[in-house]
Amino acid sequence: MSKQEKLSAIEHIKTASHGLRGTLKESLQDEITGAIREQDQALVKFHGMYLQDDRDLREERAAKKLDKLYSFMVRLRIPGGLMTPEQWITAHHVAGEYTTGVIKITTRQTIQLHGILKNHVKPTHQNFSKVKLDSIAACGDVNRNVACTSHPAESLLHKSIHAYADRISRLLLPKTRAFYEVWLDEEKIAENTETDPLYQDRYLPRKFKIGICIPPNNDVDVLANDLGLIAIIEDGKLKGFNIAVGGGLSTTHGNADTYARLATVIGFTDTEEKTLKAVYETLTIQRDYGNRSDRKLARMKYTLDNMGVDAFRKELEKRCGFPIEDPKPYEFTQR
Protein backbone atom coordinates (compact mmCIF):
# COMPACT_ATOMS: atom_id res chain seq x y z
CA MET A 1 0.00 0.00 0.00
CA SER A 2 0.97 3.62 -0.42
CA LYS A 3 3.22 4.73 2.45
CA GLN A 4 4.13 8.32 1.75
CA GLU A 5 5.24 10.01 4.96
CA LYS A 6 3.71 13.40 4.17
CA LEU A 7 0.30 13.72 2.60
CA SER A 8 -0.47 16.60 0.26
CA ALA A 9 -2.73 19.34 1.61
CA ILE A 10 -5.74 18.24 -0.42
CA GLU A 11 -5.62 14.81 1.24
CA HIS A 12 -6.31 16.37 4.63
CA ILE A 13 -9.12 18.46 3.17
CA LYS A 14 -10.78 15.39 1.66
CA THR A 15 -10.68 13.26 4.80
CA ALA A 16 -12.03 16.10 6.95
CA SER A 17 -14.76 17.09 4.49
CA HIS A 18 -17.63 14.99 5.91
CA GLY A 19 -18.35 13.40 2.57
CA LEU A 20 -17.42 16.43 0.43
CA ARG A 21 -19.75 18.75 2.34
CA GLY A 22 -17.09 20.89 3.99
CA THR A 23 -18.58 24.29 4.78
CA LEU A 24 -20.13 24.79 1.35
CA LYS A 25 -23.53 25.73 2.72
CA GLU A 26 -21.96 28.40 4.92
CA SER A 27 -19.83 29.66 2.04
CA LEU A 28 -22.90 30.11 -0.14
CA GLN A 29 -24.60 32.20 2.53
CA ASP A 30 -21.66 34.64 2.74
CA GLU A 31 -22.83 37.65 0.73
CA ILE A 32 -19.67 39.69 1.32
CA THR A 33 -17.71 37.87 -1.38
CA GLY A 34 -18.48 36.14 -4.64
CA ALA A 35 -15.98 33.44 -3.70
CA ILE A 36 -16.21 30.51 -1.30
CA ARG A 37 -13.87 29.50 1.50
CA GLU A 38 -10.43 28.25 0.50
CA GLN A 39 -10.95 24.63 1.53
CA ASP A 40 -14.37 24.61 -0.10
CA GLN A 41 -12.70 25.63 -3.36
CA ALA A 42 -10.99 22.23 -3.36
CA LEU A 43 -14.17 20.36 -2.47
CA VAL A 44 -16.43 22.07 -4.98
CA LYS A 45 -14.42 20.42 -7.76
CA PHE A 46 -15.90 17.06 -6.72
CA HIS A 47 -19.31 18.64 -7.33
CA GLY A 48 -18.24 19.40 -10.92
CA MET A 49 -17.26 23.04 -10.50
CA TYR A 50 -14.28 25.39 -10.40
CA LEU A 51 -14.13 28.84 -8.85
CA GLN A 52 -12.72 31.33 -11.36
CA ASP A 53 -12.32 35.08 -11.74
CA ASP A 54 -12.09 37.54 -14.63
CA ARG A 55 -8.33 38.02 -15.05
CA ASP A 56 -8.80 40.95 -17.40
CA LEU A 57 -10.41 42.92 -14.58
CA ARG A 58 -8.00 42.06 -11.77
CA GLU A 59 -5.87 45.22 -11.95
CA GLU A 60 -8.84 47.54 -12.45
CA ARG A 61 -10.75 46.07 -9.52
CA ALA A 62 -7.66 45.99 -7.30
CA ALA A 63 -7.07 49.70 -7.99
CA LYS A 64 -10.62 50.37 -6.82
CA LYS A 65 -10.02 48.12 -3.79
CA LEU A 66 -12.69 45.74 -5.00
CA ASP A 67 -12.71 41.98 -4.64
CA LYS A 68 -11.96 39.93 -7.75
CA LEU A 69 -14.95 39.30 -10.00
CA TYR A 70 -15.54 35.68 -9.05
CA SER A 71 -17.74 33.21 -10.87
CA PHE A 72 -18.08 29.46 -11.27
CA MET A 73 -17.58 27.03 -14.11
CA VAL A 74 -19.96 24.06 -14.12
CA ARG A 75 -19.06 20.91 -16.07
CA LEU A 76 -21.82 18.36 -16.57
CA ARG A 77 -21.56 14.59 -16.26
CA ILE A 78 -22.74 13.18 -19.59
CA PRO A 79 -21.44 9.59 -20.05
CA GLY A 80 -20.71 8.97 -23.71
CA GLY A 81 -21.77 12.52 -24.59
CA LEU A 82 -25.42 11.67 -25.24
CA MET A 83 -28.00 14.38 -24.47
CA THR A 84 -31.73 14.42 -25.17
CA PRO A 85 -33.28 17.38 -27.03
CA GLU A 86 -34.92 18.46 -23.76
CA GLN A 87 -31.56 18.43 -21.98
CA TRP A 88 -29.91 20.51 -24.72
CA ILE A 89 -32.73 23.04 -24.66
CA THR A 90 -32.31 23.31 -20.88
CA ALA A 91 -28.56 23.85 -21.29
CA HIS A 92 -29.33 26.61 -23.81
CA HIS A 93 -31.76 28.22 -21.36
CA VAL A 94 -29.33 28.02 -18.44
CA ALA A 95 -26.51 29.42 -20.58
CA GLY A 96 -28.60 32.42 -21.52
CA GLU A 97 -30.00 33.01 -18.04
CA TYR A 98 -27.06 32.44 -15.70
CA THR A 99 -23.75 32.27 -17.62
CA THR A 100 -21.66 34.12 -20.19
CA GLY A 101 -24.07 32.77 -22.79
CA VAL A 102 -21.55 30.32 -24.22
CA ILE A 103 -21.83 26.52 -24.10
CA LYS A 104 -18.39 24.91 -24.43
CA ILE A 105 -18.20 21.34 -25.71
CA THR A 106 -15.23 19.49 -24.22
CA THR A 107 -12.97 16.81 -25.66
CA ARG A 108 -14.44 14.34 -23.15
CA GLN A 109 -17.97 14.56 -24.53
CA THR A 110 -19.52 16.90 -22.03
CA ILE A 111 -20.28 20.62 -21.79
CA GLN A 112 -19.03 23.47 -19.61
CA LEU A 113 -20.76 26.70 -18.65
CA HIS A 114 -18.73 29.66 -17.38
CA GLY A 115 -19.39 32.93 -15.60
CA ILE A 116 -22.00 31.67 -13.12
CA LEU A 117 -22.26 34.00 -10.13
CA LYS A 118 -22.44 32.44 -6.67
CA ASN A 119 -26.13 33.17 -6.18
CA HIS A 120 -26.89 31.59 -9.56
CA VAL A 121 -25.15 28.26 -8.93
CA LYS A 122 -28.07 26.61 -7.13
CA PRO A 123 -30.64 27.66 -9.76
CA THR A 124 -28.28 26.32 -12.42
CA HIS A 125 -28.15 22.88 -10.78
CA GLN A 126 -31.86 22.88 -10.03
CA ASN A 127 -32.66 23.53 -13.69
CA PHE A 128 -30.39 20.72 -14.83
CA SER A 129 -31.79 18.35 -12.22
CA LYS A 130 -35.27 18.72 -13.72
CA VAL A 131 -33.99 17.06 -16.91
CA LYS A 132 -31.87 14.45 -15.10
CA LEU A 133 -28.51 16.14 -15.57
CA ASP A 134 -25.91 16.80 -12.91
CA SER A 135 -22.24 17.65 -12.52
CA ILE A 136 -21.35 15.09 -9.83
CA ALA A 137 -17.73 13.93 -10.17
CA ALA A 138 -17.16 15.88 -13.37
CA CYS A 139 -14.03 17.26 -11.66
CA GLY A 140 -11.98 16.24 -8.62
CA ASP A 141 -10.09 13.14 -7.50
CA VAL A 142 -12.68 10.66 -8.73
CA ASN A 143 -13.65 8.93 -11.94
CA ARG A 144 -14.46 11.68 -14.45
CA ASN A 145 -16.87 11.70 -17.40
CA VAL A 146 -16.66 8.37 -19.24
CA ALA A 147 -15.91 8.88 -22.94
CA CYS A 148 -17.14 6.44 -25.59
CA THR A 149 -16.47 6.37 -29.32
CA SER A 150 -19.75 4.64 -30.08
CA HIS A 151 -22.84 6.47 -31.32
CA PRO A 152 -25.78 4.41 -30.05
CA ALA A 153 -27.89 5.06 -33.16
CA GLU A 154 -25.31 3.51 -35.49
CA SER A 155 -26.31 -0.09 -34.74
CA LEU A 156 -27.59 -2.32 -31.95
CA LEU A 157 -23.99 -3.33 -31.32
CA HIS A 158 -22.92 0.28 -30.93
CA LYS A 159 -25.89 0.92 -28.65
CA SER A 160 -24.94 -1.99 -26.39
CA ILE A 161 -21.34 -0.79 -26.12
CA HIS A 162 -22.36 2.83 -25.57
CA ALA A 163 -24.45 1.66 -22.61
CA TYR A 164 -21.24 0.69 -20.81
CA ALA A 165 -20.36 4.37 -20.47
CA ASP A 166 -23.46 4.99 -18.37
CA ARG A 167 -23.09 1.77 -16.38
CA ILE A 168 -19.49 2.55 -15.50
CA SER A 169 -20.32 6.14 -14.63
CA ARG A 170 -23.05 5.01 -12.23
CA LEU A 171 -20.87 2.26 -10.77
CA LEU A 172 -18.08 4.69 -9.93
CA LEU A 173 -20.12 7.62 -8.61
CA PRO A 174 -19.34 8.76 -5.05
CA LYS A 175 -22.00 7.60 -2.57
CA THR A 176 -22.15 10.87 -0.65
CA ARG A 177 -25.40 12.85 -0.84
CA ALA A 178 -23.49 16.13 -0.45
CA PHE A 179 -24.33 17.36 -3.96
CA TYR A 180 -28.05 16.90 -3.40
CA GLU A 181 -27.98 18.52 0.03
CA VAL A 182 -25.93 21.57 -0.96
CA TRP A 183 -27.33 22.37 -4.41
CA LEU A 184 -30.77 20.75 -4.49
CA ASP A 185 -31.76 21.34 -0.85
CA GLU A 186 -32.19 17.66 -0.04
CA GLU A 187 -32.73 17.16 3.67
CA LYS A 188 -30.02 15.21 5.45
CA ILE A 189 -31.67 12.21 7.10
CA ALA A 190 -29.06 11.23 9.69
CA GLU A 191 -25.46 11.85 10.68
CA ASN A 192 -22.65 9.42 9.83
CA THR A 193 -24.84 6.97 7.90
CA GLU A 194 -22.96 7.03 4.59
CA THR A 195 -20.42 4.44 3.57
CA ASP A 196 -18.49 4.48 0.32
CA PRO A 197 -16.64 1.19 -0.23
CA LEU A 198 -14.90 2.51 -3.34
CA TYR A 199 -13.77 6.01 -2.41
CA GLN A 200 -13.95 5.70 1.40
CA ASP A 201 -13.09 9.10 2.92
CA ARG A 202 -9.91 9.64 0.87
CA TYR A 203 -11.28 9.35 -2.65
CA LEU A 204 -8.56 8.85 -5.29
CA PRO A 205 -5.07 10.38 -5.28
CA ARG A 206 -5.86 12.20 -8.55
CA LYS A 207 -8.42 12.37 -11.31
CA PHE A 208 -9.22 9.17 -13.18
CA LYS A 209 -10.27 9.05 -16.84
CA ILE A 210 -11.90 6.16 -18.69
CA GLY A 211 -12.43 5.78 -22.43
CA ILE A 212 -14.24 3.13 -24.48
CA CYS A 213 -13.63 2.49 -28.18
CA ILE A 214 -14.59 0.14 -30.98
CA PRO A 215 -11.71 -0.74 -33.33
CA PRO A 216 -10.76 0.20 -35.95
CA ASN A 217 -11.93 3.63 -34.70
CA ASN A 218 -9.95 5.23 -31.87
CA ASP A 219 -11.36 8.74 -31.75
CA VAL A 220 -11.36 8.77 -27.93
CA ASP A 221 -7.58 8.16 -27.83
CA VAL A 222 -8.25 5.17 -25.62
CA LEU A 223 -4.56 4.62 -24.79
CA ALA A 224 -4.30 8.14 -23.38
CA ASN A 225 -6.74 7.29 -20.58
CA ASP A 226 -6.03 5.99 -17.10
CA LEU A 227 -8.18 3.02 -18.08
CA GLY A 228 -9.32 2.10 -21.56
CA LEU A 229 -11.78 -0.51 -22.77
CA ILE A 230 -11.22 -1.75 -26.31
CA ALA A 231 -14.25 -3.60 -27.65
CA ILE A 232 -13.46 -6.94 -29.29
CA ILE A 233 -15.94 -7.73 -32.05
CA GLU A 234 -16.19 -11.13 -33.75
CA ASP A 235 -18.81 -11.94 -36.39
CA GLY A 236 -20.63 -8.73 -35.55
CA LYS A 237 -20.96 -9.60 -31.86
CA LEU A 238 -19.29 -8.17 -28.77
CA LYS A 239 -16.99 -10.80 -27.27
CA GLY A 240 -15.64 -8.63 -24.46
CA PHE A 241 -13.09 -5.92 -23.86
CA ASN A 242 -9.33 -5.61 -23.84
CA ILE A 243 -8.33 -3.63 -20.75
CA ALA A 244 -5.67 -0.94 -21.09
CA VAL A 245 -4.22 0.74 -18.00
CA GLY A 246 -1.88 3.64 -17.30
CA GLY A 247 -2.30 6.11 -20.13
CA GLY A 248 -1.79 9.85 -19.82
CA LEU A 249 -0.07 12.44 -22.00
CA SER A 250 0.42 15.29 -19.55
CA THR A 251 3.82 16.31 -18.18
CA THR A 252 4.98 19.08 -15.86
CA HIS A 253 7.45 21.49 -17.45
CA GLY A 254 10.81 21.31 -15.74
CA ASN A 255 9.94 18.17 -13.76
CA ALA A 256 11.90 15.26 -15.20
CA ASP A 257 10.00 12.79 -13.00
CA THR A 258 6.83 13.37 -15.01
CA TYR A 259 6.26 11.86 -18.44
CA ALA A 260 3.69 10.99 -21.08
CA ARG A 261 2.71 7.35 -21.38
CA LEU A 262 0.43 5.23 -23.53
CA ALA A 263 -1.70 2.74 -21.65
CA THR A 264 -0.56 -0.88 -21.49
CA VAL A 265 -3.08 -3.48 -22.66
CA ILE A 266 -2.95 -5.93 -19.76
CA GLY A 267 -5.73 -8.40 -20.53
CA PHE A 268 -9.24 -9.28 -21.65
CA THR A 269 -12.61 -9.84 -19.96
CA ASP A 270 -15.39 -11.72 -21.70
CA THR A 271 -18.54 -10.79 -19.75
CA GLU A 272 -20.19 -7.59 -18.56
CA GLU A 273 -19.90 -8.70 -14.95
CA LYS A 274 -16.16 -9.34 -15.24
CA THR A 275 -15.55 -6.13 -17.16
CA LEU A 276 -17.32 -3.96 -14.57
CA LYS A 277 -15.55 -5.79 -11.75
CA ALA A 278 -12.15 -5.24 -13.39
CA VAL A 279 -12.91 -1.54 -13.88
CA TYR A 280 -14.01 -1.16 -10.26
CA GLU A 281 -11.00 -2.97 -8.81
CA THR A 282 -8.59 -1.02 -10.99
CA LEU A 283 -9.81 2.06 -9.16
CA THR A 284 -9.37 0.39 -5.77
CA ILE A 285 -5.75 -0.39 -6.66
CA GLN A 286 -5.17 3.23 -7.63
CA ARG A 287 -6.89 4.31 -4.41
CA ASP A 288 -4.63 2.12 -2.28
CA TYR A 289 -1.31 2.35 -4.14
CA GLY A 290 -1.43 5.80 -5.74
CA ASN A 291 0.89 8.60 -4.63
CA ARG A 292 -0.84 10.84 -2.07
CA SER A 293 2.24 12.90 -1.33
CA ASP A 294 3.07 14.42 -4.73
CA ARG A 295 0.07 15.15 -6.93
CA LYS A 296 2.28 15.55 -9.99
CA LEU A 297 3.13 11.84 -9.64
CA ALA A 298 -0.29 10.62 -8.57
CA ARG A 299 -1.93 9.50 -11.82
CA MET A 300 -2.52 5.85 -12.67
CA LYS A 301 0.46 5.68 -15.04
CA TYR A 302 2.90 6.27 -12.19
CA THR A 303 1.13 3.73 -9.99
CA LEU A 304 1.37 1.12 -12.74
CA ASP A 305 5.05 1.77 -13.38
CA ASN A 306 5.88 1.75 -9.68
CA MET A 307 4.13 -1.59 -9.22
CA GLY A 308 5.16 -3.13 -12.53
CA VAL A 309 2.68 -4.44 -15.10
CA ASP A 310 2.91 -8.08 -13.98
CA ALA A 311 2.44 -7.21 -10.31
CA PHE A 312 -0.48 -4.96 -11.18
CA ARG A 313 -2.20 -7.70 -13.16
CA LYS A 314 -1.73 -10.18 -10.32
CA GLU A 315 -3.17 -7.71 -7.83
CA LEU A 316 -6.11 -7.05 -10.13
CA GLU A 317 -6.80 -10.78 -10.48
CA LYS A 318 -6.60 -11.18 -6.71
CA ARG A 319 -9.13 -8.41 -6.12
CA CYS A 320 -11.42 -9.55 -8.92
CA GLY A 321 -11.40 -13.17 -7.84
CA PHE A 322 -10.93 -14.48 -11.38
CA PRO A 323 -8.05 -14.68 -13.89
CA ILE A 324 -7.66 -11.92 -16.46
CA GLU A 325 -7.33 -13.46 -19.92
CA ASP A 326 -4.57 -12.42 -22.31
CA PRO A 327 -5.45 -9.56 -24.68
CA LYS A 328 -7.21 -10.32 -27.97
CA PRO A 329 -5.89 -9.00 -31.32
CA TYR A 330 -7.21 -5.64 -32.50
CA GLU A 331 -6.16 -2.89 -34.91
CA PHE A 332 -6.74 0.85 -35.06
CA THR A 333 -6.88 2.36 -38.55
CA GLN A 334 -8.76 5.61 -37.97
CA ARG A 335 -9.41 8.28 -35.37
Range-by-range predicted roles:
Residues 1-335:
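Peripheral terminal and linker regions in Fe-S/redox and tRNA-modifying enzymes
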